[in-house]
Amino acid sequence: MNTLIQGPDHPSNAMSSRANNRSNNSRCPTCIDELDAMARNCPAHNTVNTVSRRQRRNAARAAAYRNANARVPLPLPVVSVSRPQAKASLRLPNNQVWVTRKASEWSAKTVDTNDAIPFKTIVEGIPEIGAETKFFRLLIGFVAVSDGTFGMVDGVTGDVIPDPPVVGRLGFKKNTYRSRDFDLGGKLLNQLDDRAVVWCLDERRREAKRVQLAGYWIAISKPAPLMPPEDFLVNQD
């Protein structure tokens, strides 16, 4: 009596499994499963994934419709933001101090020349300034009755007052406050003897008070502390 042995390694079970897979796949009677079809490059399975011309046309029409109705983002306007000007610090090193002097009013004149104030005139009469004083900065502020330019000029002697140099001069507007911080480089007074602040007004050069200054501030080397004479408290006949 023959007995059929059921087991995974028996040939009869393999034949039964192949038959079941063939029956499950009605499209191809040869391939066992999808992996077998890929290995064989079976045309019966490949036809399932083939895209027809109608499908391509429909996909192209759908893409064209989506593109036509898609919202295109509008470009955002670019607004330029001006950077604030760096503000100069008024703090000084420990070896420097500020001294100040009130500016005098300008009188009327009979000629249309430029206006100049020599640096030695600006610092004249300030008690803290001496022969050994070093000058580091000069601050000025003013309002003029006309547009024009101003700057610090070297070599101002006599009655001839040149225009402010192109490099280093600044412009100002009529009836608008303008200020400037001049760097003096720690020089002594005799080294700044021929230096002056020059104004070149476009019009109304002969009027009184054509330029009204807010005063002068000068950064100088710290003066030696004041001490009374040694014999100040010595009583004598």
Curated annotation (Swiss-Prot):
It comes from the Viruses. InterPro entries: Coat_Ilarvirus (IPR002681), Coat_Ilarvirus_prd (IPR016405). Pfam families: Ilar_coat. Residues 1-26 are annotated as: Disordered. GO terms for cellular component: ribonucleoprotein complex; T=3 icosahedral viral capsid; viral nucleocapsid. Capsid protein self-assembles to form an icosahedral capsid with a T=3 symmetry, about 29 nm in diameter, and consisting of 12 capsid protein pentamers and 20 capsid protein hexamers. Binds to the to the 3' end of the nonpolyadenylated viral RNA and is involved in viral RNA translation initiation. Probably binds RNA and plays a role in packaging. This is Capsid protein. The lineage of its organism: Viruses, Riboviria, Orthornavirae, Kitrinoviricota, Alsuviricetes.
